[in-house]
């Protein structure tokens, strides 16, 4: 396949123009990153976004792998002297790696099989005789007599050996496998049965006597079934009409009446049962798992993206609480800039005396430091801690509220090398409380310090391919960090290393330079950082912000290469470069700017319209944090209990997690309520993430309460918007 053909195929698959694909591939080849291309090369790519660019990259890699595999297969078949025009055409037409493997199967070197042993015994000519289906050929027994030997002592052995060769040949027919694959995907059913007693089955009891068409099984069910099978609790099989498929194979391989009909029928049945069906079952099971894992990874990535985009509670003094029963609740107060001001351990669930002492101490700590928000981790003893805090606020008339924070990964961070470096004087348990406070103060800055897999906002995350999961989540972190941008003078190395063009080493060099030379005054200072050259500067500069520096445009996402253009646009509205620092002048500019003026400005300034629009947006809202467009976590002063709930009442809460079957909503109880996908919306949708995202604030009606099991059913369909 030529490069031009490959580009055309990618464009067709993604529904974009070949020129866009070509431009994106050229930019990749020049070493440009996806965030940089998406933000600053819109004219070149026709405004392709990050998702489209990543699809181009992945599809191109697939097409290259496909072309490489085709060449390997072609060379192998040629070396065997079996290459022909039909194979050449079929291989050229193959669009999937599976199609290539089907074509290669008859020529692929094999392990020792029944068929290979029969060939070694010299029975291939007898198999050819049967396959010829000569109506006037000798009887099978007579034909077999010529092949008797020490290895083949009887006529029955000879016929069976030849039949084994035929069975293998039939199993390698690409046309039948292709047709059968389509049939199985449309008609086959996945069935389960219990392998243990019902009282030992646990959640797998749901899948006792389970049967569903493979084309309809949702991904979370596939992963649940796989888990049950791995735990030896379920027996899983693919149920399909084998007799009909054997008849189809017989129709394909028996082309005319001959003395060998029964041998061919028996060989076809053996081929299907022993070779084809098990192979197809493995293939379909593997493909179902691959699709389910991809869906699970996509859901995790979508949830993670919205968690990272949660707005910060900037400028607030926050008390972080890491709840616990036996070892007590760890507390840490952080300043408006995230510095640790105070910390301690309190026993909120022990004796009344200890609870009273803890209440007095915590109330004093809150007043002493002017705490405005309390962040409570949602792990063990979270509900009990929430009850304590709610009572504390009311009893001591404290002027603060509390919020429940997702503490997943806090313990991982607190024991990490990074935590020891950042908080060397604090015990590992106190570091967890600091992290819980910081992840509310600035979720993005804190969560990037943790392996995203540990954040736990997915479904069956431990059952999927961990390498693929890590790659997908790392892409999300990188995408969000660059979308938001970071403060060059306060960002940690953990945050900086996700900026386009930067690595852990260059991020460390930036922080070292900052520590030695003081705050960066402008983006050009980056070129003084060791091992940060012009190419890296081009990639990263637009995503790094400097507040109160010498260049006002450094606090925007305008790239330095477009500063001249930005100044011309400001001049068009009557502002000089220096006036861009004046808040009053900027307010006047904001009122003057009209986004529909972009086409005329682009024409008069000889620039691309997408870049003009981006600059106008930045001049309207310089220094804006894009996370402000998203809802902040819900804060509370009072706690709910099951006894407070009534069917039909409406509650307000925060979406904790979105999965294939619905969304879990925290509205102040010990366990979150479930909005099943059937209760999410009156309008049709493909996936729950089309309706809600992790971190969203929603209202829902209580439709069921199971006090014994602690389950609450919610509906968003019945709530008036």
Predicted features along the sequence, with ranges:
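Generic start-of-chain signal for non-secretory N-termini
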Residues: 1-22, 29
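Long, highly charged, low-complexity intrinsically disordered interaction regions
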Residues: 3-6, 58, 64-82, 92, ...
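Duplex nucleic acid-engaging cores and interfaces of nucleic-acid transaction enzymes
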Residues: 36, 52-55, 62, 66-320, ...
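Short, ordered loop/turn segments at secondary-structure junctions
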Residues: 40-42, 131, 241, 323, ...
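Structured, non-catalytic alpha/beta "coupling" segments that mediate domain-domain communication
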Residues: 76, 90, 100-104, 228-243, ...
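A glycine-rich phosphate-binding loop feature that marks nucleotide/adenosyl-phosphate handling sites
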Residues: 182-190, 321-325, 380-381, 405-412, ...
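Single-stranded RNA-binding regions, centering on S1/OB-family and related RNA-binding modules
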Residues: 549-550, 554-721
């Amino acid at each position: 396949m030529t490069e031009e053909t490959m580009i055309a195929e990618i464009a067709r698959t993604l529904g974009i123009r070949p020129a866009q694909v070509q431009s994106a591939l050229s930019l990749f080849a020049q070493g440009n990153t996806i965030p940089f291309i998406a933000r600053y090369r819109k004219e070149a790519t026709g405004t392709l976004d990050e998702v489209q660019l990543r699809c181009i990259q992945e599809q191109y890699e697939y097409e290259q792998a496909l072309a490489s595999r085709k060449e390997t297969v072609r060379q192998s078949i040629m070396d065997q002297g079996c290459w022909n025009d039909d194979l050449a055409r079929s291989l050229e037409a193959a669009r999937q790696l599976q199609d290539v493997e089907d074509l290669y199967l008859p020529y692929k070197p094999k392990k020792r099989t029944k068929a290979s042993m029969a060939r070694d015994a010299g029975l291939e000519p007898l198999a050819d005789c049967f396959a010829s289906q000569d109506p006037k050929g000798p009887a099978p027994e007579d034909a077999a007599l010529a092949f008797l030997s020490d290895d083949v002592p009887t006529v029955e052995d000879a016929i069976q050996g030849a039949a084994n060769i035929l069975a293998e040949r039939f199993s390698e027919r690409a046309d039948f496998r292709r047709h059968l694959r389509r049939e199985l995907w449309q008609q086959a059913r996945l069935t389960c049965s219990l392998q243990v007693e019902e009282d030992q089955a646990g959640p797998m009891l749901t899948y006792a006597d389970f049967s569903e068409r493979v084309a309809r099984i949702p991904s979370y069910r596939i992963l649940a079934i796989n888990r049950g099978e791995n735990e030896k609790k379920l027996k899983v099989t693919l149920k399909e009409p084998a007799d009909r498929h054997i008849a189809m194979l017989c129709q394909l391989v028996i082309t005319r009446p001959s003395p060998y009909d029964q041998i061919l029928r028996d060989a076809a049945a053996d081929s299907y049962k022993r070779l084809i069906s098990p192979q197809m079952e493995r293939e379909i099971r593997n493909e179902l798992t691959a699709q389910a894992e991809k869906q699970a990874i996509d859901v995790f990535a979508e949830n993670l993206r919205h968690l990272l985009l949660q707005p910060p509670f900037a400028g607030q003094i926050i008390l972080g609480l890491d709840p616990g029963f036996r070892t007590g609740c760890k507390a840490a107060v952080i300043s408006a800039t995230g510095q640790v001001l105070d910390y301690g351990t309190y026993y909120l669930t022990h004796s009344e005396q200890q609870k009273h002492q803890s209440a007095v101490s915590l109330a004093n700590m809150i007043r002493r430091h002017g705490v405005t928000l309390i962040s409570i981790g949602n792990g063990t003893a979270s509900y009990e801690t929430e009850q304590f805090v709610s009572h504390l606020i009311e009893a001591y008339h404290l002027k603060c509220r509390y919020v429940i924070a997702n503490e997943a990964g806090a313990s991982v961070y607190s024991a990490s090398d990074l935590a020891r470096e950042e908080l060397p004087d604090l015990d590992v348990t106190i570091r967890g409380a600091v992290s819980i406070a910081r992840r509310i103060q600035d979720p993005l800055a804190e969560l990037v310090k943790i392996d995203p897999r540990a954040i736990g906002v997915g479904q069956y995350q431990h059952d999927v391919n961990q390498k693929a999961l890590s790659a997908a989540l790392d892409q999300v972190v990188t995408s969000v960090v660059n979308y938001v941008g970071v403060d060059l003078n306060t960002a940690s190395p953990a945050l900086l290393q996700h900026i386009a063009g930067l690595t852990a080493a260059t991020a460390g060099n930036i922080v070292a330079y900052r520590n030695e030379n003081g705050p960066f005054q402008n983006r050009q200072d980056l070129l003084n950082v060791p091992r940060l050259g012009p190419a890296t500067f081009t990639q990263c500069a637009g995503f790094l912000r400097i507040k109160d520096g010498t260049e006002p445009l450094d606090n925007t996402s305008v790239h330095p290469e477009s500063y001249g253009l930005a100044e011309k646009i400001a001049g068009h509205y009557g502002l000089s470069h220096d006036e861009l620092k004046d808040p009053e002048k900027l307010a006047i500019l904001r009122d003057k700017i009209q986004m529909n003026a972009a086409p005329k400005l682009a024409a008069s300034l000889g620039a691309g319209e997408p870049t003009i629009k981006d600059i106008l947006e930045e001049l309207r809202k310089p220094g804006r944090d894009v996370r402000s467009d998203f809802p902040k976590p819900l804060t509370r002063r009072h706690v709910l209990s099951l006894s407070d709930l009534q069917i039909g009442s409406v509650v307000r809460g925060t979406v904790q997690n979105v999965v294939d079957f619905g969304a879990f909503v925290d509205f102040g109880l010990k366990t979150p309520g479930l909005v099943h996908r059937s209760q999410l919306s009156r309008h049709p949708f493909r996936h729950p993430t089309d309706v809600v995202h992790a971190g969203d604030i929603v209202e829902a009606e209580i439709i069921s309460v199971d006090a014994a099991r602690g389950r609450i059913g919610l509906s968003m369909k019945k709530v008036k918007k």
